[in-house]
Amino acid sequence: MATGTDFFDQATIVVRAGNGGNGAATFRREKYVPRGGPNGGDGGRGGHVYLIADPEYNTLLHFRYQRKFVAENGGHGGKNAMHGRNGADVYVPVPPGTVVRATINGVTYTVDLARPGQRLLAARGGRGGLGNIHFTTPTRQAPRLAELGEPGQELTLELELKMLADVGLVGFPNAGKSTLLSVISAARPKIAAYPFTTLTPNLGIVEVGVQRFVVADIPGLIEGAHAGVGLGHDFLRHIERTRLLIHIIDAAGVDGRTPWDDYEQINTELRLYQPELAQRKQVVALNKADLPAAQANLPILRERLPVAPEDLFVISAATRAGIEPLLQRVAELLRADPPPQRDPVDPDEPPLEWPLPPVDENAFTVEREGDAFRVRGVKIERLIAMSNLEQDEAIDRIQRVLEASGINEALMAAGVQDGDVVRIGRAELVWDDSGQHAL
């Protein structure tokens, strides 16, 4: 039985990884050891958020009902050097063929989840904070210093499903694509006599004997679509992964256009958008043959269209005339061009990650920010995020790092003055002439 399905091909979701657990500042009870000696354990890692290509899904419809995915926070460290529990990871299923985009530090990155089982580490869980057991020194035997957990990553993801249909129906608006799909499958697309009735693809499963294939009624195309006019790119991006195109032409010219010009214009738009699309195998269906105007145009179309006779069909989607030979030819061409096999990913294969450029974690920048100064750098901002700014020992640690890393020197070179505000991450420090900072 032929079947149809709704199609939901774009979605925006938010993924938030878990925060790392806090390190513990605890002490064991032992005679002659100051405060019993530190024994605070480390916090656990926050849970990651993964996207996984799941062949059980063929649209992004499930994101209409849930758009935010949050992983578990890591557990806090405990006494006796007990390590906090790692937060549970979250796996978000998407259909194979989903393209994922995220903007990180002002740059947009793209990952393609094409193969079943492929995973993307979409949001990384925060590191657990170190317990006070790590901060003993010869001069500080009983530190109360412990780190906070690192915040988990939070990103907004743009998802786009590049359709995996076998056959795409292309043509001008109102050429009869939706009517044809409703005839050859159980899909029930919206059909009406005005342009852009189809705003999103409709999928239908077609059976020819024992052979089954997926046909997509793709939004209608107009002149300038390659530049985004009309539904433009929303039309063209859907056909990139189809193996075969059925090019439907209104042979009667009901909308006042000439059918042979329609044929040329569609192929021009395909070529301008992506040259290889114009080379993709097509069969041409001259539709609306039940109308007298179509019958008058057929001899001209047969003469003018550069289409082999075996790939040119006269049909009427309204009366179903000529449909069967068309489908037989489509099935034959698909058998001759089987889809590439996408083997499932080995479960032990590491997940994909955002293709971020290498970063020097020790690097930093100092710049004016209004009347204040802003310090940016991976390592120093992480230190601020994982420090309890109400602890004197944490502030002392920050001061030592600012001095040792050269940030203090860079601030003085930038012209910092007594009383100026210095912002690092969430912290606002005030410069004094001795080179020290205070909250």
UniProtKB/Swiss-Prot annotation:
Subcellular location: Cytoplasm
Alphabetical list of InterPro entries matching this protein: G_OBG (IPR031167), GTP-bd (IPR006073), GTP-bd_Obg/CgtA (IPR014100), GTP-bd_prot_GTP1/OBG_C_sf (IPR036346), GTP1-OBG_CS (IPR006074), GTP1_OBG_dom (IPR006169), GTP1_OBG_dom_sf (IPR036726), OBG_GTPase (IPR045086)
GO BP terms, alphabetized: ribosome biogenesis
Annotated stretches, region: Disordered: 337-359
EC number: 3.6.5.-
Gene Ontology molecular function, alphabetical: GTP binding; GTPase activity; magnesium ion binding
Residues bound to Mg(2+): S178, T198
Superkingdom of origin: Bacteria
Keyword annotations: Cytoplasm, GTP-binding, Hydrolase, Magnesium, Metal-binding, Nucleotide-binding
One family name in Pfam for this protein: GTP1_OBG
Domain spans labelled OCT: 356-433
GO CC field: cytoplasm
Primary enzyme class: hydrolase
Domain OBG-type G as annotated: residue spans: 165-335
Positions that bind GTP: 171-178, 196-200, 217-220, 287-290, 316-318
Subunit structure: Monomer.
Role: An essential GTPase which binds GTP, GDP and possibly (p)ppGpp with moderate affinity, with high nucleotide exchange rates and a fairly low GTP hydrolysis rate. Plays a role in control of the cell cycle, stress response, ribosome biogenesis and in those bacteria that undergo differentiation, in morphogenesis control.
NCBIfam families, alphabetized: Obg_CgtA, Obg_CgtA_exten, PRK12296.1, PRK12297.1, PRK12299.1
Protein name (database record): GTPase Obg
Record organism: Chloroflexus aggregans (strain MD-66 / DSM 9485)
